[in-house]
């Protein structure tokens, strides 16, 4: 059967030899030792003598090449990888072709192949497979490359061990050499895939889509159009796969819209204090955030958008022209920027676009407002941000490394933030306090203190906005607010550790619960260090709400209202939202800030160092007297502490019950079912138990059920007061 297959195959090969008489130039050898791809014509034009060894049986059954793949002009111009061949003999010829000896490759037969010198495998590096005799090389190619190949339209995609994957620069710009083992090269899209099963599925997906070599090359040569998205009356061009950071240089996440709106309201509120403001978007990507600042705030801000990637800088400049904003490069207006605007169009402002490392830029220039939004953690840029930030300026930090902050990768949190955390019911506020603590330590190293304006932790990011207070006194006061937290793993009660350097004999006494006395073993752990002071500034949040109403940002108003309720720790029914009545004079923790239009940056700086020190001193005194008015730290999840067999009251009613009991209470944006209150966990559970109803009535009348439930509630409340461990509610975390 093999001889018959060989006889049927030889006429076909002779026809191919007669047709493909094309002279192929000798390719230059790669300096790295990696063989260059061999043209189709060079391999197909070699004659196959009758004495040559018969190919594998699978080759005789290989189907003919499809017309779309054989007659495509794009394939004639392009070169496929050397691991993609028609026959096993073509792989053997590559040992001579890669050495540049095309004459010997064209006249290759079994005699001179066996009598040849030692040859190396064309698909393996020299350190993996050394040069050997022809019979060993033939056996190596057949067993380790040809038998595990993937067939597609008459071609065999053999396994390759060469370092074919291109290296990519990292964030700093250094080349990263990634180790790569055996892999396949797709004949259609030239992708590199490591496993054979994955390669089969990859080719199958191409076939299901009807893609061939010619159609894929034609589609890839056409430049994909850029999509234009609109957000807050700002148009931005985005690249294909803009929402996948691994597949694009300019990442744009539509889910971060709330983050961008919060930062815009922050800058708008700061612009009422003094103008113009020097603003920096350190990681521009598409430039959407800086474009919103310049387009809506106008001459009140001087925006600088920075990015290290050259493609992102080009995209930012295109988006500036798309929004009728002139681009400034190196303090000079970009050439040909006037030609972009048509007659009658108005220039809405200027934006400076820079291409440098964010740390270098923040060391070179001083700013009033800095926003950091790197891909991942932001701890590598905090020292540079506080180095040249102006007094009473604002630094906003967006952290997207939620796997470490939300206690999914605790070792990463210990490495980046130097703190110990576990997964708790209040893990989102714990993440916000971790970031604030890192920001406070970075500011203290630069002899600066901070005042937290607000902190937001949602599903995709953690946003922290702080005001900078210059001076060692403010730095010392800020450093004192970084403390450790004692957390009970049974009932999840928590309390910040007392100040002092003396070692306490029994730290369990600080916890309000008695789980250590009623439960075996060690019940509490130490978390932190964390920020222990307030996370919100009510006055600044009200000004942000006013700016959101002024600019018509309806999507963010609900969140800002929730932050205001949370900062004052009051139910929503006891608070009314209204615009500030006197915008010329507002107080924030003892600091009176003028917000008239006449205030400029020069007048603000000219007030002198002594005057600013007096303002900071008054701020410290006011903060000491207002410690009791701060919102209570952390919150309780009402579902986490529910009683089995009991129906909980509605959340709004439960807030009223806690308020009637004399406790401060409010909802929290960290958890939709969370309750922020200064009530201890034992009182929280007793009130929750008091107003819960049994789930099963048993067919009794309503009056009997009500009296029985009241007796049951009374007994359970007495039991909860006497036994603080409360076996029904205590669960191991």
Curated annotation (Swiss-Prot):
Q: Which terms in the GO cellular component ontology are assigned?
A: nucleolus; nucleus
Carrying Phosphothreonine, the residues are: 26
Keyword tags: Isopeptide bond, Metal-binding, Methyltransferase, Nucleus, Phosphoprotein, RNA-binding, S-adenosyl-L-methionine, Transferase, tRNA processing, tRNA-binding, Ubl conjugation, Zinc, Zinc-finger
List the residue ranges of the region (Disordered): 1-78
Q: Where is the composition biased (Acidic residues)?
A: 1-18
Positions with a binding annotation for S-adenosyl-L-methionine: 260, 307, 357-358
Purpose: Specifically dimethylates a single guanine residue at position 27 of tRNA(Tyr) using S-adenosyl-L-methionine as donor of the methyl groups. Dimethylation at position 27 of tRNA(Tyr) is required for efficient translation of tyrosine codons. Also required to maintain 3-(3-amino-3-carboxypropyl)uridine (acp3U) in the D-loop of several cytoplasmic tRNAs.
- Name-wise, this protein is tRNA (guanine(27)-N(2))-dimethyltransferase
Q: Which organism is it from?
A: Pongo abelii (Sumatran orangutan)
């Amino acid at each position: 059967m093999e001889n018959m297959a060989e006889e049927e195959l030889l006429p076909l090969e002779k026809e191919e030899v007669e047709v493909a008489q094309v002279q192929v130039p000798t390719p230059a050898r790669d300096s790295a030792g990696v063989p260059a791809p061999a043209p189709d014509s060079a391999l197909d034009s070699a004659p196959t003598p009758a004495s040559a060894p018969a190919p594998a049986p699978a080759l005789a059954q290989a189907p003919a090449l499809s017309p779309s793949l054989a007659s495509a002009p794009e394939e004639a111009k392009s070169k496929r990888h050397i691991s993609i061949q028609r026959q096993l003999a073509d792989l053997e010829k590559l040992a001579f072709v890669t050495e540049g000896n095309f004459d010997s490759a064209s006249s290759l037969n079994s005699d001179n192949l066996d009598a040849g010198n030692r040859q190396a495998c064309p698909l393996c590096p020299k350190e993996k497979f050394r040069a050997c005799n022809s019979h060993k090389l033939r056996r190596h190619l057949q067993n380790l490359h040809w038998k595990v190949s993937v067939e597609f339209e008459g071609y065999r995609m053999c396994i390759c061990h060469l370092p074919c994957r291109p290296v990519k620069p990292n964030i700093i710009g250094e080349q990263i050499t990634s180790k790569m083992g055996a892999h396949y090269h797709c004949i259609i899209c030239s992708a590199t895939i490591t496993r054979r099963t994955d390669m089969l599925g990859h080719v199958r997906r191409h076939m299901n889509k009807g893609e061939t070599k010619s159609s894929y090359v034609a589609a890839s040569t056409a430049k994909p159009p850029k999509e234009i998205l609109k957000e807050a009356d700002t148009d931005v061009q985005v690249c294909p796969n803009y929402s996948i950071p691994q597949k694009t240089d300019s990442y744009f996440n539509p889910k971060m819209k709330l983050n961008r709106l919060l930062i815009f309201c922050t800058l708008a509120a700061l612009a009422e204090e003094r103008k113009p403001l020097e603003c920096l978007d350190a990681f521009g990507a598409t430039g959407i955030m800086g474009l919103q600042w310049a387009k809506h705030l106008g001459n009140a801000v001087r925006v600088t958008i920075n990015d290290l990637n050259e493609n992102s800088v080009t995209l930012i400049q295109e988006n500036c022209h798309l929004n009728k904003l002139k681009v400034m490069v190196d303090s000079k207006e970009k050439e040909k920027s006037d030609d972009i605007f048509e007659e009658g169009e108005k220039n809405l402002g200027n934006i400076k676009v820079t291409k440098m490392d964010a740390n270098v830029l923040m060391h070179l220039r001083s700013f009033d407002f800095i926003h950091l939004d790197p891909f991942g953690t932001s701890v590598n840029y905090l020292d540079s941000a506080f180095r040249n930030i102006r007094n009473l300026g604002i630094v906003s930090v967006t952290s997207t490394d939620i796997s470490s902050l939300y206690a999914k990768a605790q070792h990463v949190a210990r490495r980046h933030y130097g703190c110990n955390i576990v997964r708790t019911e209040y893990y989102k506020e714990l993440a916000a306090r971790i970031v604030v603590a890192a920001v406070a330590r970075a500011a203290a190293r630069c002899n600066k203190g901070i005042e937290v304006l607000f902190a937001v932790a949602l599903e995709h990011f953690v946003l922290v906005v702080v005001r900078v207070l210059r001076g060692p006194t403010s730095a010392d006061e800020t450093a004192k607010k970084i403390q450790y937290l004692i957390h009970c793993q049974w009932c999840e009660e928590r309390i910040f550790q007392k100040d002092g350097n003396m070692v306490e004999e029994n730290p369990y006494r600080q916890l309000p619960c008695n789980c250590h006395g009623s439960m075996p073993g060690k019940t509490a752990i130490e978390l932190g260090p964390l920020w222990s002071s307030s996370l919100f500034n009510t006055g600044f949040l009200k000004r942000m709400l006013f700016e959101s109403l002024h600019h018509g940002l309806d999507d963010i108003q609900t969140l800002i209202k929730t932050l205001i309720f949370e900062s004052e720790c009051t139910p929503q029914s006891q608070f009314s939202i209204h615009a500030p009545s006197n915008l010329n004079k507002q107080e924030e923790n003892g600091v009176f800030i003028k917000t008239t239009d006449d205030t400029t940056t020069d007048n603000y700086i000219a007030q002198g160092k002594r005057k600013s020190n007096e303002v900071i001193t008054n701020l410290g005194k006011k903060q000491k007297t207002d410690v009791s008015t701060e919102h209570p730290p952390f919150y309780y999840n009402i579902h986490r502490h529910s009683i089995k067999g009991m129906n909980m009251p509605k959340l709004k009613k439960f807030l009223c019950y806690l308020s009637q009991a004399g406790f401060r209470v409010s909802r929290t944006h960290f958890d939709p079912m969370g309750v922020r209150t200064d009530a201890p966990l034992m009182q929280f559970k007793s009130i929750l138990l008091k107003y819960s109803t049994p789930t099963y009535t048993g067919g009794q009348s309503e009056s009997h059920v009500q009296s029985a439930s009241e007796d049951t509630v009374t007994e359970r409340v007495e039991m909860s007061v006497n036994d603080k461990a409360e076996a029904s509610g205590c669960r191991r975390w």
